[in-house]
């Protein structure tokens, strides 16, 4: 061991008189250093001694300066702050000088803190401790210049460590903001315009001519995905064999059927990759232009439904083409799908044997039905085998379990879009599904793909619906739908865990939302098996809701998103696709007829003619009754004609219901009332129990009594003075309505039409010749009756106007009689003193002369003393100038008839006395067609004249 390795023996020396500021350890350390240097180099010791003396002298000088400074402080208070600063600087210089002097003495010493009884400043202690930590280990062998620079290096390291510790303790968001502010300028300069826009121009992403090219290769439609998988497997296999293909990418696009796309640097690499591949046409290669790359490679959300067990699909090929199936499993290569199908079997019943003895299968497509073991054993037992598990069979090479066929189909023969299962198809799979008979999750997965392909939402969210976010960062957030767009729903937050989101709008995918309902809400089902049914919510179970159906009164479990709030119990039946509508008159059987008052999905509520309300299916309705206008006519209890649209009132016991007639079927009236709530306000009444309140075209007073016009025809004759304003609406409907008429005067003279409206003076006519309606005075119309025109006044039973001459049709009697005959009601009775028109007994309405209701008494005419058509006593006729009772057409005296020259009360066609027959010639009276002929003499008729009874046309 060398001397340098031995520990140095240090002896304690007494401290110098001026070393008051040095501690014992420092003095001990300085003494040891001095002895070592004296042994090695005495000159250095002397120099060290001189250096120590110089330092002591400097310290004494400093003390003297401090004393002087203290005296100056007492004398000059103004410079106190400056002197304190000087003292601090001097102390720092003194400490630094001490540090330099004892830099190399602590290499082999353990420095311990000394307990000082004196009270010192906390700042001094902290500073001393910091210095001790810095000087604990130093490099004594380093050069002096290096030793002098080390404090500065240590300070830099400490500053770096402090900054790093602060950065670690800093919050992540604050640190990100700091970095963003620090490097914002350089970031913007580097990115250029893209920093502001946030997007990169499509042209910057375009490949160059040095990049690989993309080729489109034509293939068999429907085989695109299969070819892509095969090329991928081929590339992996050849890579393992050390002969890799030079193609980079293989893909296909759903939007471009019949093509696959391969990315390669050379076309010959594509030819090599496609060697031995089927369903692909290698010669039909197309180089895709560079400008079409963005459209070709643009990411588009696939509309394909993920094929997984349980979803509904349809078969594209074979005997099961178009049939609904359920995916049971997938093959390992992903090219085959095992499906569950309802089998179509005839068990060989329709098979035929050909000339060669082979069985020819029938081309008739059997109906879908579950597999029947009994039929298979009965008709085709040799091809039936028992399966490996209970209730399974193998028939003709196919496996059947629980009556369903389980068969493998190629992936390209499976249709996953636009499946849309019907209710009848879903019922066939009811045996194995849940309590509702449907696999709701499978239907939801199927509908999700269908609606996504069409750009529609899979659920019916409407503005105002209350929803809850099911998953994501905002889960459990409740809001109200304010806007819907495709599969994105905008909601207004009403309740959230973070108050900052309240009243804010969020856009959420429709699949992440769930509708909120409460017990007691009345809802309608908009999707699923129970579509369009209504019910009352009785239970909420997660995403599903249990309701009581209004139609079946049974519990139904459906998804909450399949419901909407309903205001009524009736369903929105698809009337556009139905043969029957509400309020239609239908026939259920030969004896039952009724009106539809409610239409459900498959059930109609019908109110029958006997007042019963029955529910029938659409198949239970025989036909819809289409009655003509003529058939829907009846009479009420007063004999007034009633039609569809008239307002009637039922008078039966205490009932007093009123309404408009909706349908008329025989004696039953279906009446719609605004005062009744049940059955849409429709009730049934018998026609004999109602009275007319108002017709469709006019109003009848409710205080009308019995219809006297039907009892006494005499009341139909109006006052001649009031003929111009004659009212024809006696007892309800205007008699002229819906009659064919002809115009007799005016600019429309000769035109014919049908009366559609009428008032007291005018009638509105719809012309037959052209589609036009005209307004004409009723007096200018002729009514067409049995093909013959009848003047309007005669049609309504009124007398003709007196300003116009009208020749008599038959004859007249003596004075004091009516216009047609004495003592007789017009056109009813005739004869002398109430004799019937045909002779004999009295008429029911006849009487003596002067008793006609519409005219004056005493035999005097309205215009004179004589009758209008005959010559009575006491005055001349209106058309005759003969004194006495001369007839208009006759000049004989007395009461001769207009058509005869006989006396007294002879009939129009007879000249005998008394009530002789018209065709009798007894008692000197000749018949109208006998001895008194028109061209003969004697007691002649109207066309002959003799002995005073001269005819108007002859003078024989």
Curated annotation (Swiss-Prot):
The keyword Transcription applies. It is found in: Nucleus. Residues 67-94, 111-129 have a biased composition (Acidic residues). Residues 939-956 have a biased composition (Polar residues). It comes from the Eukaryota. Keywords: mRNA processing, Nucleus, Transcription. Pfam families: KOW (PF00467), KOW1_SPT5 (PF23042), KOW2_Spt5 (PF23284), KOW4_SPT5 (PF23291), KOW5_SPT5 (PF23290), KOWx_SPT5 (PF23037), Spt5-NGN (PF03439), Spt5_N (PF11942). InterPro entries: KOW, KOW_Spt5_1, KOW_Spt5_2, KOW_Spt5_3, KOW_Spt5_4, KOW_Spt5_5, NGN-domain, NGN-like_dom. Residues 924-938 have a biased composition (Low complexity). Component of the SPT4-SPT5 complex. Interacts with RNA polymerase II. The SPT4-SPT5 complex mediates both activation and inhibition of transcription elongation, and plays a role in pre-mRNA processing. This complex seems to be important for the stability of the RNA polymerase II elongation machinery on the chromatin template but not for the inherent ability of this machinery to translocate down the gene. This is Transcription elongation factor SPT5. It comes from Candida albicans (strain SC5314 / ATCC MYA-2876). The lineage of its organism: Eukaryota, Fungi, Dikarya, Ascomycota, Saccharomycotina. The gene is SPT5.
């Amino acid at each position: 061991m060398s001397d340098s390795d031995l520990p140095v023996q240090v002896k304690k020396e007494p401290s110098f008189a001026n070393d008051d500021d040095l501690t014992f350890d420092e003095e001990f350390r300085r003494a040891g250093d001095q002895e070592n240097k004296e042994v090695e180099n005495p000159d250095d010791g002397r120099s060290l001694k001189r250096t120590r003396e110089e330092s002591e002298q400097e310290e004494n000088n400093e003390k003297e300066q401090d004393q002087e400074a203290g005296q100056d402080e007492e004398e000059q208070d103004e410079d106190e702050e400056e002197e304190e600063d000087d003292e601090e600087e001097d102390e720092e210089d003194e400490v630094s000088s001490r540090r330099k002097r004892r830099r190399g003495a602590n290499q082999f010493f353990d420095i311990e803190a000394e307990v000082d009884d004196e009270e010192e400043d906390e700042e001094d202690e902290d500073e001393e401790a910091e210095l001790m930590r810095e000087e604990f280990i130093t490099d004594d062998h380093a050069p002096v210049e290096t030793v002098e620079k080390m404090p500065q290096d240590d300070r830099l390291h400490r500053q770096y460590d402090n900054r790093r510790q602060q950065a670690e303790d800093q919050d992540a968001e604050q640190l990100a903001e700091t970095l963003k502010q620090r490097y914002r300028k350089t970031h913007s300069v580097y990115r250029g315009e893209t920093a502001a826009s946030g997007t990169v121009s499509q042209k910057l992403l375009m490949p160059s001519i040095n990049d690989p090219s993309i080729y489109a290769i034509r293939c068999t439609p429907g085989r695109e995905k299969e070819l892509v998988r095969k090329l991928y497997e081929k590339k992996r296999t050849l890579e393992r064999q050390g002969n890799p293909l030079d193609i980079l990418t293989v893909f296909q696009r759903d939007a471009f059927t019949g093509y696959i796309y391969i990315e390669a640097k050379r076309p010959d690499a594509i030819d090599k990759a496609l060697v031995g591949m089927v369903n692909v046409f290698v010669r039909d290669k197309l180089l895709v232009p560079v400008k079409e790359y963005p459209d070709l490679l643009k990411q588009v959300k696939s509309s394909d439904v993920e094929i997984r067990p349980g979803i509904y699909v349809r078969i594209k090929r074979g005997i099961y083409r178009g049939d609904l199936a359920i995916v049971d499993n997938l093959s390992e290569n992903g090219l085959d799908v095992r499906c569950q199908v309802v089998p179509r079997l005839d068990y060989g019943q329709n098979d035929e044997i050909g000339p060669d003895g082979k069985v020819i299968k029938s081309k008739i497509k059997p109906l879908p039905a579950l597999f029947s073991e009994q039929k298979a054993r009965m008709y085709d037992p040799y091809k039936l085998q028992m399966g490996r598990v209970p209730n399974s069979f193998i028939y003709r090479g196919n496996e059947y379990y629980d009556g369903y066929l389980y068969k493998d189909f190629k992936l390209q023969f499976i249709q996953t879009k636009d499946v849309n299962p019907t209710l009848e198809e879903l019922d066939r799979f009811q045996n194995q599904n849940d309590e509702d008979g449907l696999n709701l999750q499978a239907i939801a997965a199927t509908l999700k793909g269908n609606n996504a392909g069409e750009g529609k939402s899979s659920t019916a969210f409407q503005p105002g619906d209350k929803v809850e976010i099911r998953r994501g960062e905002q889960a459990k957030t409740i809001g109200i739908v304010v806007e819907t767009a495709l599969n994105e729903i905008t909601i207004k937050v009403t309740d959230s865990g973070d108050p900052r989101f309240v009243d804010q709008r969020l856009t959420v995918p429709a699949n992440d939302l769930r509708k909120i309902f409460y017990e007691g809400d009345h809802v309608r089902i908009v999707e699923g098996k129970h579509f369009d049914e209504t019910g009352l919510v009785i239970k909420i179970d997660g995403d599903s809701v249990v309701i009581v159906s209004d139609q079946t009164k049974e519990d139904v479990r459906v998804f909450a998103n399949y419901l909407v709030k309903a205001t009524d119990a009736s369903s929105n039946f698809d009337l556009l696709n139905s043969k029957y509508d509400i309020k239609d008159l239908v026939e259920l059987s030969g004896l039952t007829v009724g009106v539809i008052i409610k239409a459900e999905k498959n059930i109609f509520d019908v109110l029958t003619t006997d007042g019963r309300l029955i529910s029938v299916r659409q198949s239970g309705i025989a036909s819809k009754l289409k009655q003509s206008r003529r058939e829907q006519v009846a009479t009420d209890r007063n004999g007034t004609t009633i039609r569809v649209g008239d307002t009637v009132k039922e008078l039966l016991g205490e009932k007093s219901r009123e309404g408009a007639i909706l349908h008329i079927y025989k004696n039953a009236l279906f009446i719609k009332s605004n005062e009744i709530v049940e059955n849409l306000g429709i009730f049934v009444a018998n026609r004999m129990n109602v009275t007319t309140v108002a017709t469709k075209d006019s109003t009848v007073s409710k205080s009308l009594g019995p219809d006297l016009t039907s009892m006494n025809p005499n009341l139909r004759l109006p006052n001649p003075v009031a003929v111009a304003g004659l009212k024809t609406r006696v007892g309800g409907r205007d008699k002229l309505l819906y009659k064919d008429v002809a115009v007799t005067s005016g600019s429309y003279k000769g035109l014919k039409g049908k009366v559609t409206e009428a008032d007291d003076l005018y009638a509105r006519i719809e012309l037959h010749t052209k589609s036009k309606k005209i307004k004409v005075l009723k007096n200018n119309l002729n009514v067409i009756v049995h093909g013959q025109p009848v003047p309007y006044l005669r049609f309504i039973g009124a007398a003709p106007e007196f300003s116009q001459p009208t020749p008599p049709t038959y004859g007249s009697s003596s004075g004091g009689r009516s216009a047609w005959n004495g003592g007789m009601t017009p056109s009813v009775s005739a004869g002398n003193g109430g004799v019937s028109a045909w002779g004999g007994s009295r008429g029911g309405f006849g009487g003596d002369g002067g008793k006609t209701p519409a005219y004056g008494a005493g035999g005097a005419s309205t215009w004179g003393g004589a009758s209008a058509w005959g010559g009575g006593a006491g005055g001349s006729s209106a058309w005759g100038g003969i004194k006495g009772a001369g007839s208009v057409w006759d000049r004989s005296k007395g009461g001769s008839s207009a058509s005869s020259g006989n006396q007294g009360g002879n009939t129009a066609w007879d000249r005998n006395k008394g009530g002789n027959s018209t065709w009798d010639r007894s008692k000197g009276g000749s018949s109208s067609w006998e001895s008194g002929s028109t061209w003969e003499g004697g007691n002649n008729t109207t066309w002959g004249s003799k002995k005073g009874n001269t005819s108007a046309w002859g003078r024989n």
